[in-house]
Amino acid sequence: MKLKNPDKHQSLSSNAKVDKIATDSLKNETDIELKNMNNEDYLRMSEHESIDPFVSASTIQTGIGIAGKILGTLGVPFAGQIASLYSFILGELWPKGKSQWEIFMEHVEEIINQKILTYARNKALSDLRGLGDALAVYHESLESWVENRNNTRARSVVKNQYIALELMFVQKLPSFAVSGEEVPLLPIYAQAANLHLLLLRDASIFGKEWGLSASEISTFYNRQVERTRDYSDHCIKWYNTGLNNLRGTNAKSWVRYNQFRKDMTLMVLDLVALFPSYDTLVYPIKTTSQLTREVYTDAIGTVHPNQAFASTTWYNNNAPSFSAIEAAVIRSPHLLDFLEKVTIYSLLSRWSNTQYMNMWGGHRLESRPIGGALNTSTQGSTNTSINPVTLQFTSRDVYRTESLAGLNLFLTQPVNGVPRVDFHWKFPTLPIASDNFYYLGYAGVGTQLQDSENELPPETTGQPNYESYSHRLSHIGLISASHVKALVYSWTHRSADRTNTIEPNSITQIPLVKAFNLSSGAAVVRGPGFTGGDILRRTNTGTFGDIRVNINPPFAQRYRVRIRYASTTDLQFHTSINGKAINQGNFSATMNRGEDLDYKTFRTIGFTTPFSFSDVQSTFTIGAWNFSSGNEVYIDRIEFVPVEVTYEAEYDFEKAQEKVTALFTSTNPRGLKTDVKDYHIDQVSNLVESLSDEFYLDEKRELFEIVKYAKQIHIERNM
């Protein structure tokens, strides 16, 4: 999509006046002025020249699309959904034309500058072709059986093909982890491992219908559990190895480092975070999962395609060091927040009235966690003579940025800056999309267009991008040096919703990093890579923080809480809603002191006592108690598991009936027990109040009348 007419933007902007007479020097960061040059037109890049993206958007879209599709089918999906998922994956990973697997290989090879050995490449591609053909045959048989599940032959065929295909995955996975080639083969390994785990899930879902014995189903399930651990640990190990190998000292090395971090998150880590949710014993119904990690797109800065003019590329223009860039643009672990307002402060790089560039020089961001207080941060120069530009994004998802990287060139000294950005946004719950822009004018400078969708494409291409976008803008960093001002955008996945809504008919996973505040002693720390985001930690007793949750009716629905945690000590977890205690239980240590966090150190265990919410919006709090200081307790996420409504309603009614009856003597049903106190009657009244109107409305009214009678007797007795 092309940027709109610059003149149109200038006429619309109230801050479009260009300061042509500015005299401040670069030292106070108000103007950047450099001497003229005779061959400036020769060196200058063409107007609106598009930067060739480091990777084709379609390459990344494959990873984003598969993860997005799986997010919609977690738990135990319908048979038709599973067949549809396989059809989608086959189309993405084994399309007609050039092999997607080869594209994955070439992409990682280019980032890390390491070619895969010819033998390893050919062996992997050959095994992938075989797996693709076998998966297509299984998919066809699965669809035939789904259409006629009572057909004995169709059932026998799909069962036999399933067993053969699963064994084939066991045999072929090592081809994607050849010694010395683990890093360049990592996206292939992750996608193949993901398919194997999805396939193993089928035995738990369909095995009984296919005629598999209980022992056979158990074998497949146990293999799924073991392989989930092994595949996760392999992916995290080699992701970290590849990333550490790219760590450098200058800005150019940071570019490759960040590209690897971003693309491997999209193609590998996002899938790994979903692996545990394939477990049908733990997630037997529809499950809602969320990715809270952040990815950082390429810095907005000109990149000259001709090596003769490499000095005009931003990272060669005396840019900050690797560590300085990391510190400036990569956020410290924090609670998930949403961008609400950006105030932009501008600088002016000017040689003449026909060659100048107003550019982004600094900014103030306002962000807010779900239900929390406003947080403000600033970067760069905020003390300039040019009027600031303020853009509002409250309750809006910025799903795309189109940015102009500008180059103002004089003699041998280039100036890299950002003269213009279009922010495309949408209200998440409404069919309303528009854009805000930053633009104060420029002339006679070279520009390159950088479109965020080249790096973070929509999940699908069949819908408008404002409907199928995969990420939202969450933060903006600034790489700042004497002649460089380059923006770095931070993005969160769309699955991390704004509401923390708990559904009555599905398991809801809410990462604890979505809390709106941190308790004293609690900290947000980097996630280990397989959690889909950062996690919270305590080293002494106390609460972690509060989560604002929204409840979809019916309120009669009851839930059980589960916690995915890791701990170096035995402890107690306590939970409460709106300050009222609901659960307390003992939990075991999962790891030893000094041990690294890996897949096996985390467990998902819950409380047995169910509870219900009484308000549409509530505050959920969790704390860790009864352990010695110096230990470490980590929480990844909280899970709300719905309990069958009708069964729970019946149980609650029987319990309330017993409590009401217990107020009176057994010999005289109308006689109140002498030891009944006022607070006893109030407790019973609250219990009756919590009964379901949907299932026991008449009985509830009758019990209320009895409680009122007990209250009346108690008052008369005291008088």
Curated annotation (Swiss-Prot):
A GO molecular-function descriptor: signaling receptor binding
Family, per entry: Belongs to the delta endotoxin family.
Keyword terms, alphabetized: Sporulation, Toxin, Virulence
A Pfam family annotated for this UniProt entry: Endotoxin_C
Organism of this sequence: Bacillus thuringiensis subsp. entomocidus
Keyword Membrane in record: no
Keyword Amino-acid biosynthesis: no
General remark: Toxic segment of the protein is located in the N-terminus.
Gene that this sequence comes from: cry1Ib
Record protein name field: Pesticidal crystal protein Cry1Ib
Role this protein plays: Promotes colloidosmotic lysis by binding to the midgut epithelial cells of certain coleopteran and lepidopteran species. Active on Plutella xylostella but not on Bombyx mori.
InterPro entries: Galactose-bd-like_sf (IPR008979), Pest_crys (IPR038979), Pest_crys_dom-III (IPR005638), Pest_crys_dom_I (IPR005639), Pest_crys_N_sf (IPR036716), Pest_cryst_cen_dom_sf (IPR036399), Pest_cryst_dom_II (IPR001178)
BP terms from Gene Ontology: sporulation resulting in formation of a cellular spore; symbiont-mediated killing of host cell
Highest taxon above the source species: Bacteria
